[in-house]
């Protein structure tokens, strides 16, 4: 926006939120930040009203034509496909958490925390009847019906350390 105040800018985000405090996610899981909405920094309307940026959440780029300078977008809620033209294209596809190929890595009670919905899912799992809400009653291996007492945090970066700190509070 600083380079050209009149440029048409389109920002596409696959998830439901455009801008959130990812360092606050562990504190939301731990209860220090009780309201999920407190994690949100800016909304679609904030980008539109303050920065004149057309921001589309729950939308995914499913095709790029460099020859025609167009992108094909899919609305993840409605399934509708649209085509938009561009002069300059900036790719910022984000990241995905690394899930090591360990036996049981996809069982209930194993979480990645990178987005607001990830933190919501973990917090809900911690606060509800784990056996029924998580689907653990469908497994024949180790099952828990009591509140979890132990946790393992894989990753010693800021988020991992803050997650360990906040799980102690639970």
Predicted regions located by residue number:
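Beta1-alpha1 glycine-rich phosphate/pyrophosphate-binding loop at the start
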Residues: 1-60, 165-170
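Cofactor-binding loop segments of dinucleotide-utilizing enzymes, especially the Rossmann-like FAD-
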Residues: 12-14, 115, 156
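Glycine/Thr-rich phosphate-binding loops of Rossmann-like dinucleotide-binding domains
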Residues: 19, 99-100, 162-163
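Short, hinge-like loop/turn segments at secondary-structure boundaries
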Residues: 26-30, 129, 152
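Residue-level marker of alpha-helix boundaries and capping positions
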Residues: 34-35, 113, 154
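FAD-binding core/adjacent interface of flavoenzyme oxidoreductases
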Residues: 45-151
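Conserved active-site region of classical short-chain dehydrogenase/reductase
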Residues: 120, 162-165
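Hydrophobic/small residue at the entry helix of a nucleotide-binding pocket
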Residues: 159
């Amino acid at each position: 926006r600083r380079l050209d105040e009149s440029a048409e800018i389109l920002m596409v985000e696959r998830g439901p939120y455009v801008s959130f405090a990812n360092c606050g996610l562990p504190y939301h899981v731990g209860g220090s930040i009780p309201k999920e909405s407190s994690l949100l920094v800016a909304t679609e309307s904030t980008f539109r009203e303050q920065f004149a940026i057309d921001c589309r959440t729950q939308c995914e780029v499913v095709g790029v034509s460099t020859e025609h300078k167009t992108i094909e977008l899919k609305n993840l809620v409605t399934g509708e496909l649209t085509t938009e033209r561009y002069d300059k294209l900036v790719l910022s596809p984000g990241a995905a958490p690394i899930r090591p190929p360990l036996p049981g890595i996809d069982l209930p009670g194993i979480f990645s925390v990178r987005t607001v919905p990830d933190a919501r899912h973990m917090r809900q799992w911690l606060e509800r009847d784990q056996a029924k809400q998580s689907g653990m009653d469908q497994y024949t291996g180790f099952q828990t019906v009591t509140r979890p007492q132990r946790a393992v945090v894989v990753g010693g970066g800021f988020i991992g350390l803050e997650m360990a700190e906040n799980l102690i509070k639970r």
